[in-house]
Amino acid sequence: MHIHSIKLPLVELKNINVVFEQKKALQNINLTLYPNSIITIVGPNGGGKSTLLKVLLKLLPPTSGQVIYHKNLRIGYVPQKIHLDHSLPITVERFLSLKKGISRQAIQDALSLLSISHLHKNSLQKLSGGEMQRVLLARAILNKPNLLVLDEPTQGVDINGQAELYQLIQQTQQQLNCAILMVSHDLNIVMADTNEVLCINQHICCAGTPETVSNDPTFIHFFGDQFAKNVALYTHKHNHKHDIHGDICCTSDFQSQQCTHKE
């Protein structure tokens, strides 16, 4: 059965907890990814966004909880950054060919889809930030994934190139008919196309569709009202709340006068 024929989940994360040296990095995370969906993860620095991606990518085992993968799942991953050894120059084509089991035609197709065929003989070390991100995206789609995981995909890209890169990501998603899970701080650009937004600060503080977020104070408290009309969320009950810096500002026993969160 083809993975897109019915709406079976691609990945399910159930009650994921991650603890580092008795400090909770993730707490009770539940997330289900379906075919063709676009989910954007936002949250303060140190809130656990990258940790969540590592758990999903099997780079980090959760302390507790379960990750369930569809048996035909293929994941493509674009990291936030990649370390290049400038003493060992390598061309774009050679870099892409390092991925096992990939044909030259698949490499050419990926470069063509991202409009960077002209870069195939260029040295990886001499690429601009935008060119490098396109190459990393090309590498991620070589196996024609049905889930594309992007960690800050516009890292190192100037502001003029960010909107163009996001448009390219959307076009790639449509061409491959894949789902996207993306960590991003460029909320004013990505929110228009995302199906769901998750705001994470160790736990899921808020989540939902972009159309229903406009006046919710929780998201505004984190990111400001300039993004509010593009993001949706729900609020949930727990025994603490966070201020704009991610610190606990009030509990069920003590309500800070400055806290704008709702029970």
Curated annotation (Swiss-Prot):
Listed GO CC annotations: plasma membrane
The enzyme's E.C. designation: 7.2.2.20
Gene3D superfamilies for the chain: P-loop containing nucleotide triphosphate hydrolases
Main enzyme class: translocase
Membrane disposition: Peripheral membrane protein
Domain ABC transporter: 11-226
Any one Pfam family match given in the protein's UniProt record, by short name: ABC_tran
BP terms from Gene Ontology: response to zinc ion
Catalytic activity field: Zn(2+)(out) + ATP(in) + H2O(in) = Zn(2+)(in) + ADP(in) + phosphate(in) + H(+)(in)
Binding site for ATP: G43, P44, N45, G46, G47, G48, K49, S50
Location(s), subcellular: Cell inner membrane
InterPro entries listed in its UniProt record: AAA+_ATPase (IPR003593), ABC_transporter-like_ATP-bd (IPR003439), ABC_transporter-like_CS (IPR017871), Metal_Ion_Import_ABC (IPR050153), P-loop_NTPase (IPR027417)
Keywords associated with the record: ATP-binding, Cell inner membrane, Cell membrane, Ion transport, Membrane, Nucleotide-binding, Translocase, Transport, Zinc, Zinc transport
Source taxon at top rank: Bacteria
Family the entry assigns: Belongs to the ABC transporter superfamily. Zinc importer (TC 3.A.1.15.5) family.
Subunit field text: The complex is composed of two ATP-binding proteins (ZnuC), two transmembrane proteins (ZnuB) and a solute-binding protein (ZnuA).
Functional description taken from the UniProt entry: Part of the ABC transporter complex ZnuABC involved in zinc import. Responsible for energy coupling to the transport system.
Name of the molecule in the record: Zinc import ATP-binding protein ZnuC
Organism this protein belongs to: Pasteurella multocida (strain Pm70)
Native organism taxonomy: Bacteria, Pseudomonadati, Pseudomonadota, Gammaproteobacteria, Pasteurellales
Gene symbol of the encoding locus: znuC
